[in-house]
Each structure stands twice: as C-alpha cells, then as structure tokens.
C-alpha cells in the first residue's frame, strides 16, 4: 500500500501531514481538509513519486532490455500514443504547450484502464538554429544550454502528472540517438530508387546489375570500359542522397542555407527575419521526389485531417500533361532544344512566346549579342544589351522567395534577344525570362499561351505581346479564357474538344519526336545540409580529389566536436554575393583524418555541414519502441509489435504506424512529409514492417490570449499592462504609454505567455488539466482566461467533498449495501457510457461536462453519504483527467493498488434505455408544445397525448387538424 500525502501513516481520520499551517489568503478560512492548492500540491507530489518508484507507466517490449524479465509474453492488445516532441527553449513551457500532451495523456490513461498495453513517451527535439543563436548571443555552449533547458522542461512536464514511460525518453542531441540518425542517413545514401519496382533498393544491387550486364547505362556507354571514377559518378547519380549544384536559399544574416519551408512568403528567413537570396551552391540533396506518387497515393489510407492531406497533396502537386520541344539557337550558333512542360498541350498553337526561369541553365547561352532591330522598349528592361538586362533582372529578383514570385500581381521580365521555333506552327516566338517561372518546377521553362492562361495574359499585356485565341468561347481581349470549348486557329486540331485535342497533339508530338505525355510534380528534392554547428554531423569524408565517401557503420557515431567558436560566419544580411563558411571548418583536428576505407590509410577531410533540424524528427517514433538498443535503431520485433499493420483492427489497407499522433498543423509539409519519406525508404529496405509512420493524426488547436502592442507595433509584456478607463496602458521606462489590445496565439513572441507553474502553484496540476480539457474540442483554438480556471478547481472540490468530510477528513461514503434507485442507476450508467465514448474519441471537453453533470446529480441526490457503488465509478471516470486526485481518493476508499490500470467501469445497457420519450408537437411546422409518453407508446397513443396537451389545445382554439403526422421517437406535426 502506498502512503497518502495527506494522511499520517496509521491514521484513519485522514489528518493532513506536512501541510503548512499558513494557507493562502483566499482559503485561509477554509475547512482543514478542503481540496486546496496546497493539499493538491502534496497529493500530486506524492503520487508522482509513487508512479516513478513503482514504474506504473513502464510498458514491456517483446525483446531486448525492456522485455519482461520472467520471459512472459507481452499483451496482444496494445496502443502506441505519441506527441510531437517539444523543442526545449530557454523560456520553458507556457500554458499552450501542454494542451496536446494532456489530451494524449487522458487518451492513454483511459485505454490503459481498459486493459491495453499503452506506449506513451516524450523526448526532446533539441538540435537546431535557436539553441545555436542563443549560444552565440550568450557565449554559452549550445549543449550546456540545451541540457539545462531539457531539465527544466522535464520538471515542468513532470508537474502535470503525464503518464509517460520515462525510460524511453531521449533528446535528439544524445550521441546514442544521433548515431542512428547517421545510420539511417547511410541507409538512404547507399540506396537507389528502382522506378520499375517503385521502391528503394540497396546500391549494391545496382552495381551488381551493371557488373552482370543485366542493366545498361542510359547514355549508351559500356560499363565494363568505365574507369573507377566514372563508375563512381554513375552510382552517385543514382543514390537517394546526392550532391548537386542547385539553386538554394542563402541567408547571409544567418550564415546558412535554408529549405524552402524555412523562408517566409516575403522572401525572408523564418527565424531572424533576414533577407534570403537565391544562389547556386553545391549541396546535399535527398531524392524525395522519387517517392512523389507513393507519398500522394498513400494519403488515402491515412486517418489524417483533410486539411493536412490537402496541404500535402498541393505541396506534392501532381500534374498530368505533355512535354514539348522548342528549338533555339545558342549564341555560338549551335541548335538546342528547349523543353517545356504543359498541362494544356491542346493550346500549343496559341503559344506566342517562351518564358524561362531566370536561373535556367540555358539562359546565358541564349542571350543575344544585341537587341534585334525594332525591339519593343518594354522588352528590354532599360538594358543597353540583352546581357545587361538579364544581369540587372536577376539581381532585382534575387531577394524574392518562390512563393512571392508566384503570387506577385505585377508581371515583369526581359527579352533574351533570341527566338525559338514553336513545334506546332513552325513560327519563331521570342524568349523571355520572368520571375513567375521557377527553375524547380517542370523544366524551368514554359510555353506562354496568353489567350488561355491569366498569368501569361497579364505578362503579355504588360509587355505588348500578341494574344491568340485557340479555344472558342471567351473574350480574350478582356481576360484569358480558361473554360472548355472547341479548338480554333489550331490547324489539324480545329473543331476538336479540349480533351480530344490534348490526346491528338500529344500523339503528334510523340510521333514527330518533339515531345511526349508526362507527369510532373511541384515537390522538389529535399535540401539536406546546413552551414551551422548545432546539428548532426554527416558520416561522410572527402578524398584528395573531393570525392565523397560514406563511412562504414562501425565508424558511427561521428560525434559533434566541441569547438571554442561555434558561431557561423555571418555576413551583411544584404550581401547576396557572400559564400557559406560552416563553423565545423574551424575544428581542424576533427576535420582532417587518416582512414583506411579499404584501400590503405589515406588522408580525408570530414564534411563540415550538419543535417537540418528535421533529421531527428524524421524517425524518432521508431526509437521510442526500442530506446536502449545499442545494436540497431530498433529491433524488428519491437517495431512490428508496436507499429506493424493490424488489418483485423484497421482493415486490409492498414499501413501500420503509430496509433495516435498529436501535434500542430504547421508541420504538414515539413516534418510530416519528411518522416513519411524516411519511413518508406526504411520499409523498402526491409528495416520496418509499417509503410507509414503515423496511422492516425490529430492537430490540436492553439491556446490564445490577449497581447498588447505600442504605437510602433512592438509587443509589451501582457502581465504588466493596466486596464484603465476603457483603454490599456503600459508602465514603460519613460512613463505610461498607451497600448492596444489584440488576440493571438499565446507565446513568447507576443509576450503574453503564462507559465503552467503559475497555475499549478495557485490551483494544482489536476485543475490545470481539467481546465484545458474543458475549454473546447482538441482541434479548436480556444481563449485562455485565468479567471475561469477556478471553475475547474471547484468541480474537483465537489468530487473531493463527495468522498471526504472537509472538517474531519473522514470518509463520507456509505458502505452499507442498499438498493439504488432507478434515477441514480440511470445517471450512473449513462455517465459511464458517455464518458467512455468521449474519452475514446478524444472529446475530453464533453467528458468533463458529463462528469460535472453526474457529480452535481450525486451532490443533490445524496446529501449525507454517497453509496460506494456510485462514487467509486466516478473516481475511476475522473482518473484520466485528474489522476492525482483520483489516486488519492481511491486509496482513501480502501484500495491498496493504483487505479492507473483500471478497471474502467462498464455501463449496464439496461439503464441506457429511456422509459419515456419527449415529443415536440408542431402545428403547421412550428413547435407549440411538448408531451412525454412511454418509450413503447404506439402512434395512436402519441397522437392522443399531443391533442390533449393544453398548450396545443389553446393554439388550435377548437379547430381539428386535417392531418396528424408522427415521426417515431422524434416529433408530432399537426396540419391544420
């Protein structure tokens, strides 16, 4: 039996022990045994200690160090619940952070009480730019600060009573963790995507196929005649991880390259708000595009919010169309093919100009020596020559993000001074560059059809280009016509429908060798390198020729070295011509190594980039299943047990994965997409049994609160704002200033954070849990109001009073067996059924409402002593929401074991059936009265009751209805 925090061992009266005599002022006159913040603090502290000592939430694995020591089998009925793990910032938690954590804890506790083996753990996503920036500002090493932050987060989370298996917690910065991040990187690096098999395969199998002659080189060369270096180049070009000279988002102010998702819509860094420039650099890339179809198609088997699925579908962006080859002439006189991709090949006859992305590889080759005679000044951008105009335009758009370029309403561009031949008409069309065409989508070149594409129409109008109608039905003098119609001005396509024309022109392009049917995606390969310090080092070294070599798995982990200067080389934020200089380049002893990679001891240099902050979160769910495994990232048996497909439970298409994943929708096209990609590669290579990482996803809403800004729009600390005379003032350093109230997401940026420590101190953790769960559906954002927290506290006080006499501490429960009245039994079993259904569906707010209703019923119905048979089920039902209070009451009721493993009460179906039914009575469609009849009353009895109702009779005023309609169990309608 565990010792109660509020009872002296051996005492039967429940007299408090260790509770200070001076309680807070608000409750100084309260009865000695009332459920107060101080009593709650003692209860919570002791039960948290008990849970930790007893390992209450520790769950067994089938194999390994967490398997049952006696060799017993693990339960078949299991559940894996996971939260998006937090970044341990220096500010600690605010009350918005625990919303999802509490919700999943309620869900996990409920299912644990139902007898399921529940895995619920929480780690920390601790690598990344924020810790590095803080370290640079303060001179504190990122690891020192991060570890201190993790300790504080664990303390704050521990106060909430979350039922996590603490043995499974880790940080992505733990060497034992990122060793396996590096290992997974090597698995992806040493793999290639077999398009015919639609899966990844080991790179060794590709080499074997080339060696045997089973596979030929696409360029026609003979594999057997290639040098070792040439063979390595071929293999490197097939890898799922590769280096490429690609356009990247270079941020001089941060000294690093950013992924597209880390750049805001106005072309600035998400962190720091620095300008970001498009720049060509050699970078590590991950070939996520190889999985475009599978990432898209497998969304159909996931139980995810439609919003997130739509965001991923749009981000992947599958488009069906055709490629077409326009021929042009280089500046040296050579003919070159300009390939475009279009979803509207039917409009090819209407293509009156071409547009290339300013970064397109062929732009410099196609720039004319001078402007053709009679060139329109609108085309030249004010440049004396095409080369000058192109250079100036590139400089002007370098600061724009991809999103800003696509959404810009003002269409700009410059003429290259050269033309290409339209394969449909045989006529020359001018070639432009413009920022609304992106190098990363399609071929980086488009055929412009201003008559039937609004962006092209806007561009043509701005630069005075011709507009040709090829689909009848609109007025192209006013706007582009994008509807259906019959083809016109299109040669052999005239008279065809749009669908017929698409097929016909695609077939003609294929037969003439000028194009083919094609599918394109918006998704780009993943830029997988950062010029920072605080991240996972790459398990890659370079030889004297600069060729990369993967380290053997036995060389892992490649540990991040401690260096005296870990700050990146920062540049003038506006210096677009600066070049990255990673901090790890300063660690010379670590950088230069001698290794034997199979051909003798040779000098190598390590890669000085680090992995992006998304690396650890792309696989961390797997490590929860086997956190101490030193030989594998996780044992296959453990992954299969926790994450394997369960078709009997979820249907034949069940992809497997975590049973419930809860986190913010802001990660839809970042973490969630990257995690799916890594998981699919591991699945293809046979390392996991599940083909998706997360079977079910729920996005929790935000907790919002008032924030305040001064006249400049800068936020001021909300807790220091004073409301006065209908307005708000802030006591600044130079006196009071007027501030303006707004409503937004709670957090440090708006300076309106409220610490959960503050609420726990004032009310107790169980009160915070109940309040946050009662605020609304988990998916909805909700306003925080500290003044409303007291309502949750008073509810728990009422539950406490049903069991404990506030004056004496004695148990009030009636143990004498007595026959319960029907109303009490009906209230009990309806509460059980409703609360259980709500917990299972994560409707915690309505579960709270039902528990309050049942508590109020017991308070009114049983004023002296509540029968044990109806109070114990209440304690069990409250346990997922307020576990500390429930454990304490459960023990005081005489139980010697924790209720964490149940059993959760079961409802008796006999008491869920109504004896009576209330019918609204309508007269000509409007409700005029209500009648209550027996649940088994037939239509005649219902009609009679409706006609006999005094309110209905008064409204009828003696008139007889022409028709009486009874909708069984729902309503009666009298037609007069």
Curated annotation (Swiss-Prot):
GO terms for MF: aminoacyl-tRNA deacylase activity; ATP binding; leucine-tRNA ligase activity
Residues at which ATP binds: 748
Catalytic activity as recorded in UniProt: tRNA(Leu) + L-leucine + ATP = L-leucyl-tRNA(Leu) + AMP + diphosphate
Superkingdom of origin organism: Bacteria
Span(s) of short sequence motif 'HIGH' region: 86-97
PROSITE patterns: AA_TRNA_LIGASE_I
Listed Low complexity bias regions: 1-23
Keyword tags: Aminoacyl-tRNA synthetase, ATP-binding, Cytoplasm, Ligase, Nucleotide-binding, Protein biosynthesis
Renumbered residue ranges of the record's region Disordered: 1-34
InterPro entries for this protein: aa-tRNA-synth_I_CS (IPR001412), Leu-tRNA-ligase (IPR002302), Leu_tRNA-synth_edit (IPR025709), M/V/L/I-tRNA-synth_anticd-bd (IPR013155), Methionyl/Leucyl_tRNA_Synth (IPR015413), Rossmann-like_a/b/a_fold (IPR014729), tRNAsynth_Ia_anticodon-bd (IPR009080), Val/Leu/Ile-tRNA-synth_edit (IPR009008)
GO CC, alphabetical: cytosol
A Pfam entry, by short name: Anticodon_1
Motif ('KMSKS' region): 745-749
Entry's family note: Belongs to the class-I aminoacyl-tRNA synthetase family.
NCBIfam families: leuS_bact
Protein name, UniProt field: Leucine--tRNA ligase
């Amino acid at each position: 039996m565990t010792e109660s925090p509020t009872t002296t061992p051996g005492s039967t009266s429940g007299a408090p022990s260790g509770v200070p005599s001076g309680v807070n002022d608000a409750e100084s006159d309260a009865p000695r045994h009332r459920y107060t913040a101080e009593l709650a603090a003692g209860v919570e502290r002791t039960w948290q200690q008990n849970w930790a000592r007893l390992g209450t939430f520790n769950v067994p694995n089938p194999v390994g160090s967490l398997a049952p020591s006696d060799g017993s089998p693990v339960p078949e009925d299991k559940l894996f619940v996971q939260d998006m793990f937090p970044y341990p910032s220096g500010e600690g938690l605010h009350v918005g952070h625990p919303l999802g954590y509490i919700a999943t804890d309620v869900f996990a506790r409920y299912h644990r009480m139902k007898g399921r083996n529940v895995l619920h753990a929480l780690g920390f996503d601790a690598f990344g730019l924020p810790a590095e920036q803080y370290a640079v500002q303060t001179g504190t090493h990122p690891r020192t600060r991060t570890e201190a932050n993790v300790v504080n987060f664990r303390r704050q989370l521990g106060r909430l009573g979350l039922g996590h298996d603490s043995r499974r917690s880790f940080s992505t910065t733990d060497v034992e963790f990122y060793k396996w991040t590096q290992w997974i990187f090597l698995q992806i690096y040493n793999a290639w995507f077999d398009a015919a098999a639609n899966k990844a395969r080991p790179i060794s199998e590709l080499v074997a196929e080339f060696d045997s002659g089973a596979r030929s080189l696409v360029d026609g060369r003979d594999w057997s005649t290639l040098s070792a270096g040439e063979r390595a180049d071929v293999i490197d070009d097939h890898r799922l991880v590769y280096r490429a000279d690609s356009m990247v988002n270079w941020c001089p102010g941060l000294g690093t390259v950013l992924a597209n998702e880390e750049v805001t819509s106005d072309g600035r860094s998400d962190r720091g708000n620095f300008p970001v420039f498009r720049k060509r650099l050699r970078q590590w890339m991950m070939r996520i595009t190889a999985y475009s179809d599978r990432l898209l198609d497998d969304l159909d088997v996931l139980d995810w919010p439609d919003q997130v699925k739509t965001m991923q579908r749009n981000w992947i962006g599958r488009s069906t169309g055709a490629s077409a080859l326009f021929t042009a002439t280089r500046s040296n006189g050579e003919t070159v093919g300009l390939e475009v991709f279009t979803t509207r090949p039917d409009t090819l006859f209407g293509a009156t100009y071409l547009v290339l992305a300013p970064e397109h590889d062929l732009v410099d080759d196609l720039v004319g020596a001078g402007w053709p005679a009679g060139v329109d000044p609108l085309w030249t951008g004010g440049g004396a020559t095409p080369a000058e105009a192109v250079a100036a335009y590139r400089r002007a758009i370098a600061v724009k993000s991809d999103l800003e370029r696509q959404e810009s309403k003002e269409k700009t561009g410059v003429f290259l001074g050269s033309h290409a031949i339209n394969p449909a008409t045989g006529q020359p069309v001018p070639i432009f560059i413009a920022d609304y065409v992106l190098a990363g989508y399609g071929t980086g070149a488009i055929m412009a059809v201003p008559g039937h594409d609004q962006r092209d129409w806007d561009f043509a109008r701005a630069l005075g280009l011709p507009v040709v109608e090829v689909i009848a039905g609109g007025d192209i003098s006013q706007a582009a016509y994008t509807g259906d119609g019959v083809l016109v001005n299109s040669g052999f396509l005239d008279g065809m429908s749009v669908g017929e024309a698409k097929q016909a022109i695609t077939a003609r392009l294929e037969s003439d060798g000028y194009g083919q049917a094609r599918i394109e995606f918006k998704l780009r390969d993943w830029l997988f390198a950062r010029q920072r310090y605080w991240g996972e080092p790459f398990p890659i070294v370079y030889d004297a020729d600069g060729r990369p070599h993967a380290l053997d798995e036995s060389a892992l982990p490649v540990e991040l070295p401690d260096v005296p200067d870990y700050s990146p080389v920062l540049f003038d934020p506006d210096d677009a011509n600066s070049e990255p200089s990673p901090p790890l380049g300063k660690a010379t002893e670590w950088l230069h190594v001698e290794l034997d990679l199979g051909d003798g001891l040779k000098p190598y240099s390590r890669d000085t980039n680090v992995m992006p902050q998304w690396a650890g979160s792309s696989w961390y769910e797997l490590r929860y299943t086997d956190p101490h495994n030193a030989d594998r990232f996780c044992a296959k048996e453990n992954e299969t047990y926790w994450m394997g497909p369960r078709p009997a439970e979820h249907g034949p298409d069940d992809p497997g994965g975590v049973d419930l994943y809860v986190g913010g929708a802001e990660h839809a096209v970042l973490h969630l997409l990257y995690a799916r990609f890594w998981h699919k590669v591991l699945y293809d290579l046979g390392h996991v049994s599940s083909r998706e990482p997360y079977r079910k996803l729920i996005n929790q809403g935000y907790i919002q609160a008032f924030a305040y800004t001064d006249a400049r729009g800068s936020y001021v600390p909300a807790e220091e704002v004073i409301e006065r005379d209908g307005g708000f003032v802030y006591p600044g350093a130079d006196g009071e200033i007027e501030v303006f109230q707004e409503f937004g997401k709670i957090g440090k940026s708006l300076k309106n954070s409220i610490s959960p420590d503050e609420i726990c101190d004032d009310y107790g953790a169980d009160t915070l849990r109940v309040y946050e769960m009662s605020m609304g559906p988990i998916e909805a954002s909700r306003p925080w109001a500290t003044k409303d927290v007291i309502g949750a506290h008073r509810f728990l006080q009422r539950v406490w009073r049903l069991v404990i006499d506030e004056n004496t501490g004695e148990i009030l429960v009636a143990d004498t067996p007595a026959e319960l009245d029907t109303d009490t039994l009906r209230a009990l079993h309806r509460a059980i059924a409703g609360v259980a259904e709500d917990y299972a569906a994560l409707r915690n707010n309505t579960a709270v409402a039902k528990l309050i209703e049942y508590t109020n019923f017991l308070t009114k119905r049983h004023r002296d002593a509540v029968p044990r048979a109806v109070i114990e089920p209440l304690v069990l039902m409250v346990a997922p929401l307020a576990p500390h209070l429930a454990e304490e009451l459960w023990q005081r009721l005489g139980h010697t074991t924790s209720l964490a493993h149940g059993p959760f009460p079961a409802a008796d179906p006999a008491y869920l059936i109504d004896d009576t039914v209330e019918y609204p009575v309508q007269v000509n469609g409007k409700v005029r009265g209500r009648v209550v009849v027996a649940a088994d009353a037939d239509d005649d009895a219902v009609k009679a009751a409706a006609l006999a109702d005094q309110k209905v009779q008064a409204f009828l005023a003696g008139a007889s209805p022409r028709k009486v309609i009874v909708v069984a169990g729902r309503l009666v309608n009298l037609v007069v």
